[in-house]
Amino acid sequence: MSEKQAHTRVIQGKVISQAGNKSIVILVERKVVHSKYRKIVKRFKKYTIHDENQSAKIGDVVSAIECKPISKTKAFRFKEIITAGVEL
C-alpha cells in the first residue's frame, strides 16, 4: 500500500481564486524546452483543488497532492501553504 502512495503527484502553484465552497483554483507554472527553437518557454495550467478547511487565501503559494477524483474537475487535495500571500 505504501508503494502505491509513493507515486502520487505533488503540484505547487499560486491560488488565483476561490471556486466555491471548499474549492480553490491554483495556477501551476512549468518550464519546457521548445522542440523547434530550443528556447525555454513557460507553460501554465489551472487546477481545481479540494480545500477541506478553507485555509488557503488568494495569493498564497500552496502544494497539493493527487487523490481519487472528488468531482468532475477536482482530483487534487490541499496539502500545505508554502508561502502566505499579501492581503490587499
Swiss-Prot record:
Record carries keyword Cell membrane: no
Gene: rpsQ
Gene Ontology annotations for the cellular component aspect, listed alphabetically: cytosolic small ribosomal subunit
GO MF annotations, alphabetized: rRNA binding; structural constituent of ribosome
Quaternary organization: Part of the 30S ribosomal subunit.
Family indicated by similarity: Belongs to the universal ribosomal protein uS17 family.
Alphabetical UniProt keywords: Ribonucleoprotein, Ribosomal protein, RNA-binding, rRNA-binding
Gene3D superfamilies, alphabetized: Nucleic acid-binding proteins
CDD domains assigned: Ribosomal_uS17
Function: One of the primary rRNA binding proteins, it binds specifically to the 5'-end of 16S ribosomal RNA.
PROSITE patterns with a match to the protein in the record: RIBOSOMAL_S17
Protein name: Small ribosomal subunit protein uS17
Species annotation: Helicobacter hepaticus (strain ATCC 51449 / 3B1)
One GO term (biological process): translation
